[in-house]
Amino acid sequence: MPTIQSIKTHDFRRKLMDGAGSDAVHTDPSYGYGVTLLKADNGLEGTGIAYTLGAGTNLICEAIRILGESLEGREIEELMADFGAVQRSLAEHPGLRWLGPHKGVTHLALASITNACFDLWAKSREVPIWKLLLNLSPEELTRLIDFSYLEEVLTISEANELLHSYQATRSEREEVLKTGYPGYDTSVGWFQYSDEKICNNARAAVDAGFTAMKLKVGAKDHKHDVRRSLMVREAVGDDVRIMLDANQAWPLPQAIDACLALKDMNPFWIEEPTQPDDVSAHQKLAEVIAPVPVAVGEAVSNRVLWKNFLQAGAVGIVQADCTRLAGISEWLAVVILARKYPVRLVPHVGDMGQIHQHLVLFSHI
């Protein structure tokens, strides 16, 4: 079995042009990765990523170098046999923990390292990641997860029982391997796009077969958002799902006013309406705008915060992201939490590497 011989990092950035990627808060983004490269003694290389908007990617790479040192010389099967314990030891690094804990630069570095471990493991077994995960027993899956700080709501035995309960009907869901799963076009309505460009993009998305799309909102004057959302609704008709994404732009009073005004266009969800750590604000907003669900996740950094959101009924769409959480391992913990409560899971795709194509297949089946 392959043994990790070296750990390298790469600071990858790509500038976006002409308003692409813009939202109400992030006005001039690049797309970037803090990349982990795990080179094995048999020539295989595991690649992991954590997503950024460019600036600061070098900080993640430096944290990867420090956290990754302990993985050199580890055999991949032995490493992954109890990866939950491995991840906890990395997250509790006595020097770097103070910079988090479980959030920020060090947590993004852990995401990149974890994703590289899973990639190397899948390559060593000669299967894609979705197949790797589906081939594991519930007990093997739960050994990949650090359950610390979740014990009062989700024990390992409860997680195993929940996973076993889905196996009886698994064959009914495997049809998705033939048909594929539905997606939505997130590039239709970037915040800095003109009205004309948004309408043209929306119609083109429908012509391409999309039945759902996203529009960026979050203007200081919500009349601007209402006008644009109704414009898109008119362009694509009532049968197309339109999701609205404010990217954390509003304080709670403004979020309530804006979301109530936007309800008339029948959004499929309203995403990141306010500060991403503010569970009580999301709880209040979810009550006020029901039955329209509140979607959060791309900036929810760890399983404990997800526990709080789910306990409070503050989220209607779980958009867990394995490049924001501590990689696939912590993402699995959030998936099981979401299944327990239960709340609908729509993984966030904060990556150009498309890890989530694998994770969506796994979570659906």
Stretches with model-predicted labels:
Residues 73, 127, 292, 343, ...:
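Short glycine/serine/threonine/alanine-rich loop segments
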Residues 215-351:
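Catalytic core of soluble alpha/beta enzymes
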Residues 2-242, 247-256, 260-264:
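N-terminal capping/lid subdomain adjacent to the active-site entrance of alpha/beta enzymes
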Residues 2-14, 33, 329, 333-334, ...:
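Flexible C-terminal active-site loop/helix
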